[in-house]
Every structure is written in C-alpha cells, then in structure tokens.
Amino acid sequence: MDYEALKDQWSDVEERDGIRLSWNTFPSTRMEASRLVVPIAAVYTPLKEKPESPLLQYEPVTCKAPCRAVLNPYANVDVRARIWICPFCLMRNPLPPHYKDITENAIPPELHPQSTTIEYQLARPAPAPPIFVYVVDTCQEEDSLKALKDTLILSLSLLPPNALVGLITFGTMAQVHELGYTECAKSYVFRGSKDYAAKQVQEMLGLLAPGPRPNVPQQPARPPVGPAARFLLPVQQAEFQITNVLEQLQRDPWPVANDKRPLRCTGVALSVAVGLLETSFQNAGGRVMVFTSGPATEGPGHVVGPELKEPIRSHHDIDRDNIKYYKKAVKFYDALAKRAANNGHVVDIFAGCLDQVGLLEMKNLSNFTGGHMLLTDSFTSSQFKQSFVRVFDKDANDNLLMGFNASLEVLTTKELKVTGLIGHAVSLNKKSSSVGETECGIGNTCAWKMCGIDPASSYGVYFEIANQGGPAAVQPGPQRGMMQFLTYYQHSSGHYHLRVTTVARPLSGPTGDPALAQSFDQEAAAVLMARIAVYKADVDDGPDVIRWVDRMLIRLCSRFADYRKDDPTSFRLEKNFTLYPQFMFHLRRSQFLQVFNNSPDETAFYRHVLNHEDVGDSLVMIQPTLDSYSLEHEGSQPVLLDSASIQPTHILLLDTFFHILIFHGETIAEWRKAGYQDQEGYENLKALLEQPKEDARELIADRFPLPRFIVCDAGGSQARFLLSKLNPSTTHTTGGYGGGVTSQTIFTDDVSLQTFMDHLMK
C-alpha cells in the first residue's frame, strides 16, 4: 500500500474515531518496541463531533468485573448461544434478555463494523444543572471594565436557561455577591491580605448547613436548595438581577499611588470561588471563570509586590533562581487546582493585560481541570470578545458543546500496557492489569479525570509492550493488540454520556518485520514527541530537553534510514519518515522550547494550547504553514518555510495557529501605497490583495483561541513575526535582509541536518 493511500486511511480513522497512532502496527516484543525510539502512543480526541452517528438511549453491555470492557465490533458473538466473548480478557458473557432477537443479519448498532466509536446516553441524571461562577477583577481602567461587563452580560444569553450563575469581584478585597437578595445589592467581603482556610470561607458564607448530600439523586429539574442558592441563581430566573449587579460594578475604590501597582487579591477570590462550589456542588459540573487584568499583588498567591520598581519575574530570573514569590504562589495555586479537580470543577483564566498576570504560577488551575487559558492585550480587544463567546458554542440541538466532570479510562489487551497520559487531566490513581511498569506523563493509573472537556480536547496516551519476548511468546496466526477508551462525561442536556472507542491494530511478525516501519505516522509521532518534550521542559532545563529531542531524532534515523557508513550523501529516508526531521527542527526552534523573547506567562499559555489540540492543529503550531500569492498564479501555493520564499512581487500568508500574518513583498507594498488597485485596469491586483484576506478569514472561522491577525509590509516592524519563523537560507540572501541578518545565528535546516548526518555516520 503506498504512503498516500495509508495517509487517507489514517485520516478516515481520525474522522471516525478521533484517534491517530504513532505506529499502526504494534511490535510483538518489548525489545523490538525499544528499538522503535518513538513510543507506541495515541493522540485521542474523545468528544470529536460525529453528527451522523446515533446516540444510543440504553445502558452499554459490559464484561464482568474486574475487566468491565464494553461490547464492541471486535467481540465474538455467538448468536445461537446468546453469549459474547470479550476480546480483552477472553471471558464468556451472556447477552442481556433484550438482545434475544438478534440474528447474523440483525445486530445492534454497537456491533456494526463501523461502530468502533459509539456514544451512549446513560440513565443517570446530572446532580445539578451546569454552574458558572464569574470572578471579575475590578482593578482596571474604565473602558476595559465596561467592555468586560458588556461581554459578560452578553454571555448570560448564551447559557442554558437552567444554568446557575454566581459572581465574585475582587480588587483589594474579594466580594461574593448575594444575587438572591433583591432588596439592595448585598455582598460578603473577604480581606485580600488573609489566607482563608476552606472551612473559614464556608462558615463565613453560611454554607455549612446541610446542603444537598452527594450521592443522593436529585431531580434535575428542581433548582438546588440549600445555603448556596443565595449566591448561585438559575439564569432564566435571575438574568435581570445579575445584569443589574454587573452594570453597577465600579472600579476598585482603593487609591493607587503613581509608583505602585493596584492591590489585587486574585488568590483569595479564587479560593473563595473554589470553596463556594466545594460544599454544595461536589462532583456537579461547574466552571470558575476568572477575568484578570493584572498580577496578584496581595494575599496568598501574589506573584509580585505592589512597588512598580520591582519588576515581575522573567525567564532569566527563574533560571537564576531569583524568584522570591514564585514557589509559594505555585504551591498555593496547585493546592487550589487539586481541590477543584477533585470536586469536578473547571477553572478558566482569561487575562486582558499587556503585562504578565502570573499565568505561570496559576497555569495548573487550567491544566489540571481542563479549563481554558486565554492571553489577550485587553478586554476591549475583539480577540477576547470573540474567543470568549466561542467558549459557549452549541450543537445542532442547542446544547453547549462543552462536557463537564469527565473521566477517561483506558483498557488494553495483554500485549499492551498503558504508561501514562499527557494533556489537561489529573490521575484517578486507578490500578488495573492494563497499567504499565514505566511512566510517561501522568502515569501509574489507567484512568484520569478531566473535569472540563470540549470537542477539540485531545490527549496523548502512551503505551508499552508487555511481552518480554522469547520463543514461546510468539503465537502462530495473525495477532492483534487492542485498546478501548471509555469517556464518561456530564452532557449539558443534563444526562451523563459514555463515549466508547475501540482500536485494534496488527502485531508485527518476527524481528525485523517491514510492516512496522511502513505503519509509522510521522505527523502523529511528531505531536506525541512534542508533548513529551514540553512535559519535560516544565521540570527540566531547556537545553537538556533540546538535547533529548536531538538524541531521539538521531536514534530514529539511525534505525530507519538507509545509508552507507562514512558516506553522508547516501542518506535516504522512506516517504513516511521524510518530514519527521524537519518537524523536529522546527520544534526545537519553536516558542514551546525556546523561551527567549517570550515572557514566562506566554510560554505557559503556548504550552497549554499545544496540550489541548489535535494532530493537525498541533502541527501548525510546531511547523507553521506558509502560502504564497502572486499575479502569475491563480489562488495560493504552499511554499517552504524559508527566507527564499520572500519575493518582492508575492504576498505571503503565514499561519502559526496563534498568529495569522499577511506579508506584502516590497513591490506589491509600493503598488498598494500608490493606490494602483483602485485604478481601472488593475482589477487583478485588487483581487490579489483580497485573496489572502479571504483565506485568513476561513482559517480564523473555527479556531480557539482566536489568533492575532497581522498585516505587514516588507521592512515593516511587524514583519519580525514572519522572519522569526523562517529558515534563514545562507546560500542566497533575499533582497539584502531576512536571510542576511539572521543567517549567522541560525544555521539552515540543510546544514543542521547535514552536520547531524555526519555525526550520525561517525
């Protein structure tokens, strides 16, 4: 089968099952697996939208404990004897009575060969409607606060009518607004400088009265009773009150001297929000949405002092350990993040500020709970407004696309063991026969809790081969290894859903089976390795991680490339390996591993987004796409990410996922400034200038977070965004800049790979 046909097959599987594997044939022994260099792993998108597949309105048929695998197309079903054999543990299970009418030709949907991914609506209702707590920073300029209030008021109309909404505002103090009190505006005030224990918060808010007990089913239609109902009201009942309170929000009245930062107690506000949901709504889906316009400067979790002369920490300070607030703040926010994750609640962080706000310290609030993280210059920007509205996207039945309180469990057949997950989740510490001995990412468990999950949420799941090898280990006949992914989540319609994906792949034959190399998916592998590199970069030194990336690439090439010793020119890679070295070249230059020129907050944001997206979008972040437009060609043409692609008569469109940039070559820019496009007879120039804008609009259409849109000319200051991504060819400097300026510092792709190959031969 040629590579193109294989690629089509893999993308069909991705469409159907939301999964891409690094190797589509599994090695049969652990020894063989270790020689593959890239681990056996999957990028899995559990909630990938599948509008055409049916939602099954009954409970799934499961295997006996401890296996609990769900009936799937790979199970052997004996129609006459009414039994099925589980492919994971080989146990025989009776089919339930309502399956009595099945025949060879009439089988239930979950046994259809195409039903490798299927979704069940479970009978178990959600304990409460979805909850949204807005936590709003009032230490900001009037125009920015007004823009934020308008966006929040607009968002009320996007929530399900039964959703519960709460409001906490913070500046020097944190205030919990009692929305249920209609006579006048009433709020509970917490001192910004004090670290409140969870119990204190709950006592002060009067929440320790007997609330709805967990594990006792409640009718989903009734709004919850209990003390928290004063602070959290159903939108349909209280939209007017909430709108009123939001409209009347004022800037924080505390005076701020010119040489000081405003006192901002982000930590206290977050701790109160988590405490509010913890008592009455444990394991009910909820989101704490924080809107901050500056760093926390007071109380627990502050990241910088109030004096402006003291700058907020940079990467350089962190490297030199010159960080007096960092460790304490991280410890505080991590403890909060763990509490929120255990309760099943999501924390989203929206920053509207030109300076850093302390995302680096707060990042695990979103990373542990599956929350969103958004970094914008101001709440007045369209980037913030449009991205925020996109959080509330709905499906065809007008249900929110976000799932709440989710968990993912992975089962494997005896050949495979799961070693861990890299993505936005925490471990559920569940042990089973599927758990491996080694650890990659969040390991030593076969189940993880996500809290927040949406149709784009993707997870890297890593595996190892259990089989030690030896003559008895290889059985005759074709073998296959299997994995099953079970995703439970609270759907916004008020029911729990279960999405089941079952994957089977052949096991390789005896050592040296060529099927292994042919089954390598270089795109999925690059993304899975990038996730490991970023995971390492959070704990290890930057240069060490880049050395690790290089080492892994050298080992992969020495294993799979054809070359004659001491003859670099003889180096050849198979078609499905050729792009992998350049993905790695761009990964090591990317903002995920090179922190130079980015603030620690930006680095935390970029890494957060990489760990959320699927293979296609992650690849755009690692190796941006570049398209060229000119009068000679109709439409756009993909060109190399290289300074040789800059031509005076071409327009370039660069997509880095976070930025979309239109770059006008020198001549085109001069024509445009001279106004030729508005003159008669130059319609083709006008069309040429419009075309990239149209294409950029399409790229932006369904992307979250909304990318920054930049239009620039050759030689303009904004052109730096393009130049920093290009591979500077040293062979020909383009028009005297671009290549010429940077070619001394960064070697070209070819040279680096060439040196690389020379080292390899040695």
Swiss-Prot record:
Keywords: Cytoplasm, Cytoplasmic vesicle, Endoplasmic reticulum, ER-Golgi transport, Golgi apparatus, Membrane, Metal-binding, Protein transport, Transport, Zinc. GO terms for cellular component: COPII vesicle coat; endoplasmic reticulum exit site; endoplasmic reticulum membrane; Golgi membrane. Belongs to the SEC23/SEC24 family. SEC23 subfamily. GO terms for biological process: COPII-coated vesicle cargo loading; intracellular protein transport. The lineage of its organism: Eukaryota, Fungi, Dikarya, Ascomycota, Pezizomycotina. GO terms for molecular function: GTPase activator activity; zinc ion binding. It comes from Aspergillus clavatus (strain ATCC 1007 / CBS 513.65 / DSM 816 / NCTC 3887 / NRRL 1 / QM 1276 / 107). PANTHER family: PROTEIN TRANSPORT PROTEIN SEC23. It is a peripheral membrane protein. It is found in: Cytoplasm; Cytoplasmic vesicle, COPII-coated vesicle membrane; Endoplasmic reticulum membrane; Golgi apparatus membrane. InterPro entries: ADF-H/Gelsolin-like_dom_sf (IPR029006), Gelsolin-like_dom (IPR007123), Gelsolin-like_dom_sf (IPR036180), Sec23 (IPR037364), Sec23/24_helical_dom (IPR006900), Sec23/24_helical_dom_sf (IPR036175), Sec23/24_trunk_dom (IPR006896), Sec23_24_beta_S (IPR012990). Component of the coat protein complex II (COPII) which promotes the formation of transport vesicles from the endoplasmic reticulum (ER). The coat has two main functions, the physical deformation of the endoplasmic reticulum membrane into vesicles and the selection of cargo molecules. This is Protein transport protein sec23. Zn(2+) binds at residues 63, 67, 86, 89. The gene is sec23. CDD domains: Sec23-like, Sec23_C. The COPII coat is composed of at least 5 proteins: the sec23/24 complex, the sec13/31 complex, and the protein sar1.
